[in-house]
Amino acid sequence: MAPLTEVGAFLGGLEGLGQQVGSHFLLPPAGERPPLLGERRGALERGARGGPGSVELAHLHGILRRRQLYCRTGFHLQILPDGSVQGTRQDHSLFGILEFISVAVGLVSIRGVDSGLYLGMNGKGELYGSEKLTSECIFREQFEENWYNTYSSNIYKHGDTGRRYFVALNKDGTPRDGARSKRHQKFTHFLPRPVDPERVPELYKDLLVYTG
């Protein structure tokens, strides 16, 4: 199923939310108060309280972009068809071409183009590939001062400190325990890199139109 078809009316069905168009939102009818960012995020988190990770966000509106996700440890994150997540040093690996779907300001889901699986993180801080878009597949995208990004779970954090679980890759390319990873560590620092369609034409055959 196409990601933007699968990502549909969950946010649209939440009361008071405007309609997202590109990177902007249409204003609600005159007289209605536009939603605040905290309310939009809060609605996503409330949707997960019925059982973290089990709530399927099958109708989430979003804007899609394709990138590679390069970690400061020297690896591109990839999602394999068997549901495992690991790093690869190969540039433009098929399993390392990812679709970033913006579901709210600062919130994204990440889907492997070739595997068709969404990046997820469970309550133990373990990364995995999910066939369905659930609340465990929503991450907070934070732009850091060193020009890298961090991605943290939208629902899992330490109860005592409030520190969130972070997506991270070890120095050998294996996924790092998100519960033990911290924002300032290079394991958690990622750089979204552009994708050259000519390097992976098989992933763009339905999008590209060739003219002779």
Curated annotation (Swiss-Prot):
One GO term of the biological process aspect: regulation of cell migration
Keyword Nucleotide-binding: no
Cited SMART domains: FGF (SM00442)
GO molecular function annotations of the record: fibroblast growth factor receptor binding; growth factor activity; receptor-receptor interaction
InterPro entries per UniProt: Fibroblast_GF_fam, IL1/FGF
Pfam families in UniProt: FGF
Gene3D superfamilies: 2.80.10.50
Primary location class: secreted
Keywords: Growth factor, Secreted
Location within or outside the cell: Secreted
Tissue-specific expression: Preferentially expressed in brain; substantia nigra pars compacta.
Domain of life: Eukaryota
GO CC field: cytoplasm; extracellular space
Signal peptide region: none
Record note on quaternary structure: Homodimer. Interacts with FGFR2 and FGFR4. Affinity between fibroblast growth factors (FGFs) and their receptors is increased by heparan sulfate glycosaminoglycans that function as coreceptors.
Similarity section: Belongs to the heparin-binding growth factors family.
PANTHER family, per database record: FIBROBLAST GROWTH FACTOR (PTHR11486)
Role of this protein: Neurotrophic factor that regulates central nervous development and function. May play an important role in dopaminergic neurons in the substantia nigra.
Protein's name according to its UniProt entry: Fibroblast growth factor 20
Organism name: Rattus norvegicus (Rat)
